[in-house]
């Protein structure tokens, strides 16, 4: 995992394309989630990014916050993700299921 992180960090430090940097931050945040480094993941996801990534960033932030036990913040993140994603499609349905699962676990 460390090798993947160092390679992704290199891309983040050297890439000129902002969309590529946005994607790399998303991947690094996922690794931080896997490592239970929730603050690092949130920091990456709170970084300014292209609008087209809003739904993806918010969804992963919801996952991070859920794992960190911050349920009300996770609900808010999932709601942002739903608002930013198209109303139809599988991904929208998955995020809706995550939000519904949090509501059931009150």
Predicted regions, residues:
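Conserved positions within tetratricopeptide repeat
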Residues: 5, 22, 42, 75, ...
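A broad helix-preferring feature
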Residues: 8, 62-63, 68, 77-78
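Alpha-helical adaptor scaffolds
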Residues: 1-56, 61
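TPR/TPR-like (Sel1-like) alpha-helical repeat modules
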Residues: 50, 71-89
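"A position-specific structural signal for the A-helix of alpha-solenoid helical repeats
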Residues: 27, 56, 60, 67, ...
């Amino acid at each position: 995992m460390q090798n993947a992180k160092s390679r992704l960090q290199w891309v983040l430090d050297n890439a000129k394309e902002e969309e590529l940097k946005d994607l790399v931050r998303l991947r690094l945040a996922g690794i931080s989630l896997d490592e239970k480094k929730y603050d690092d993941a949130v920091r990456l996801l709170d970084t300014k990014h292209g609008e087209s990534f809003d739904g993806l960033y918010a969804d992963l932030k919801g996952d991070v916050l859920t794992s960190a036990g911050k349920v009300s913040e996770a609900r808010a993140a999932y709601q942002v993700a739903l608002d930013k994603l198209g109303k139809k499609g599988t991904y929208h349905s998955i995020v809706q299921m995550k939000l519904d699962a949090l509501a059931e676990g009150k």
